[in-house]
């Protein structure tokens, strides 16, 4: 394991030059202190977890110190926000400190969010507040633990720096990690500003560093776009299968790597609600839970438009046509597994759709239903779950279909079925009310709840002794919370 001063930097994006980013130094926080750190994320940098408790850790990730090899840059990009094009966005409060490569040869971006004003801050102050930083940290690590591709979070650093939002809050910084911070909006920026040389340089950078296997294909850029389409179809299938609502699927929040990126007013479903809107600024429901699937395709089409200098329109349309079939196949496979099924039948999609319709009409907890379905043999499990439903006749009909489907699935033992279902159906998810409780404690100076919640969520499929309160339905006040974008 390494100490902080032993990290090895290789700042490949910074070498693209000033057309792609601007050199900016972080603005230090007052009295920086560790709120929470992720040992799993630290391991990706080969860092000894104990260094998180040292003063220099808070100073480095609180903007007071920099590695000599770091090259902090604010990236420029644009994007479609709620369907309308915004010509210039960029890192308004975040800095790419540099790229570190570990002993396995992996490169990781170190991106400091809340690092102060940049040329792209527009009307903002360049700061992030403690509550939004905690939410991003918890979500990044929780999604990774669920097997959902996501950026990672190394730590949150709190402070005494005052920041004004709807009220005065305390500033914080979160250190985000990813193999790249390039977004769909990077390509849109150079396309719409008519900078073909930079557009080509960016495309080569992404192809060579992040999709090198596509270089061997007859049409490398088309192969790369197809891979991006496939990754996004798989990602959004996992969002839908696990009830994750992103909240702000603007193209500047879409990673070129097909990972969950830029956490804002996100939420996991409590009761199943296909039309749930987690962002209270989304008045028309553009980014509602059920709309995430078509919006994913819309965003890919926006990226495709920006790639027309390199790829023919017909080829792009053909690649975009892969998205929905790939999404549907991935989603149905995940839902079969959540139902404990190991084989495929033609009517499985109808079985899933009928269940979700019943859950919607009865307000059934999405996560706990699937977990409890695997606790006992199918016949006993559906009997115990029956009382959660209002339409008893409808549920009874579904239960008979499900039991017959399980019977046809094979002669696996109940122990195997239970282990299989518990391996894909989490007991613990990041419910908004749990995050809110942890944030309230942290804002009063007690970081123990944030750390405990992070620890629980790092093992979402394992029953953890003494942690029953994290595996319960939310109280009435905690259901379907809508979250502000102000962060």
Swiss-Prot record:
Family annotation (InterPro entries): SelO
Keywords carried by this UniProt record: ATP-binding, Magnesium, Manganese, Metal-binding, Nucleotide-binding, Nucleotidyltransferase, Transferase
Catalytic activity: L-seryl-[protein] + ATP = 3-O-(5'-adenylyl)-L-seryl-[protein] + diphosphate; L-threonyl-[protein] + ATP = 3-O-(5'-adenylyl)-L-threonyl-[protein] + diphosphate; L-tyrosyl-[protein] + ATP = O-(5'-adenylyl)-L-tyrosyl-[protein] + diphosphate; L-histidyl-[protein] + UTP = N(tele)-(5'-uridylyl)-L-histidyl-[protein] + diphosphate
Keyword Mitochondrion: no
Binding site for ATP: 90, 92-93, 113, 125-126, 176, 183, 262
EC number: 2.7.7.-, 2.7.7.108
Co-factor requirement: Mg(2+); Mn(2+)
GO molecular function: AMPylase activity; ATP binding; magnesium ion binding
Cell wall biogenesis/degradation listed as a keyword: no
Enzyme class: transferase
Source superkingdom: Bacteria
Active site: 252
Positions bound to Mg(2+): 253, 262
PANTHER family per UniProt: PROTEIN ADENYLYLTRANSFERASE SELO, MITOCHONDRIAL
Physiological role: Nucleotidyltransferase involved in the post-translational modification of proteins. It can catalyze the addition of adenosine monophosphate (AMP) or uridine monophosphate (UMP) to a protein, resulting in modifications known as AMPylation and UMPylation.
Family to which this protein belongs: Belongs to the SELO family.
UniProt xrefs under NCBIfam families: PRK00029.1, PrtAdtaseSelOPseudom
Name of the protein described by the UniProt record: Protein nucleotidyltransferase YdiU
Organism: Pseudomonas fluorescens (strain SBW25)
């Amino acid at each position: 394991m390494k100490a902080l001063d032993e990290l090895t930097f290789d700042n490949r994006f910074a070498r693209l030059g000033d057309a792609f980013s601007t050199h900016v130094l972080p603005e230090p926080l007052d009295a920086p202190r560790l709120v929470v750190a992720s040992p799993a994320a630290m391991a990706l940098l080969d860092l000894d977890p104990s260094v998180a408790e040292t003063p220099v850790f808070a100073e480095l990730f609180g903007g007071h110190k920099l590695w000599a090899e770091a090259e902090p840059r604010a990236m420029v990009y644009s994007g479609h926000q709620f369907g309308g094009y915004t010509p210039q966005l960029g890192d308004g409060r975040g800095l790419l400190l540099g790229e570190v490569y570990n002993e396995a040869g992996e490169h990781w971006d170190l991106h400091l969010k809340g690092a102060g004003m940049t040329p792209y801050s527009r009307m903002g102050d360049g700061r992030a507040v403690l509550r939004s930083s905690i939410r991003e940290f918890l979500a990044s690590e929780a999604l990774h633990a669920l097997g959902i591709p996501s950026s990672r979070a190394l730590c949150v650093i709190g402070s005494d720096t005052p920041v004004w939002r709807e009220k005065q809050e305390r500033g914080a910084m979160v250190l985000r990690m990813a193999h790249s911070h390039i977004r769909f909006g990077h390509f849109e920026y150079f396309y719409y500003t008519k900078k073909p040389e930079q557009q080509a340089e960016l495309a080569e950078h992404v192809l060579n560093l992040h999709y090198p296997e596509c270089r061997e294909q007859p049409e490398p850029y088309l192969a790369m776009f197809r891979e991006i389409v496939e990754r996004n179809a798989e990602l959004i299938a996992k969002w839908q299968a696990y009830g994750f609502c992103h909240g702000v699927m603007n193209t500047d929040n879409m990673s070129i790597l097909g990972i969950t990126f830029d956490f804002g007013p996100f939420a996991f479903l409590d009761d199943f609600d296909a039309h749930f809107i987690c962002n209270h600024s989304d008045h028309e429901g553009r980014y509602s839970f059920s709309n995430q699937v078509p919006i994913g395709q819309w965003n890919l089409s926006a990226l495709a438009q920006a790639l027309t200098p390199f790829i023919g329109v017909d080829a792009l349309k053909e690649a975009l046509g892969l998205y929905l079939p790939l999404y549907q196949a991935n989603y149905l496979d995940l839902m079969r597994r959540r139902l404990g099924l190991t084989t495929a039948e033609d009517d499985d999609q109808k079985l899933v759709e009928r269940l979700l319709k019943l859950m919607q009409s009865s307000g059934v907890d999405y996560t706990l239903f699937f977990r409890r379905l695997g606790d006992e043999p199918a016949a006993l499990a559906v009997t115990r779950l029956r009382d959660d439903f209002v339409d008893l006749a409808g549920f009874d009909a579904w239960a008979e279909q499900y039991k017959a489907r399980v019977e046809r699935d094979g002669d696996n033992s109940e122990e195997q079925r239970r282990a299989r279902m518990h391996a894909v159906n989490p007991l613990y998810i990041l419910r908004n009310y749990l995050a809110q409780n942890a944030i309230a404690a942290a804002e009063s100076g007690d970081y123990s709840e944030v750390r405990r919640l992070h620890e629980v969520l790092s093992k979402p499929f394992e029953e953890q002794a003494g942690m029953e309160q994290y595996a319960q339905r939310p109280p009435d006040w905690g259901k379907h919370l809508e979250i502000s974008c102000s962060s």
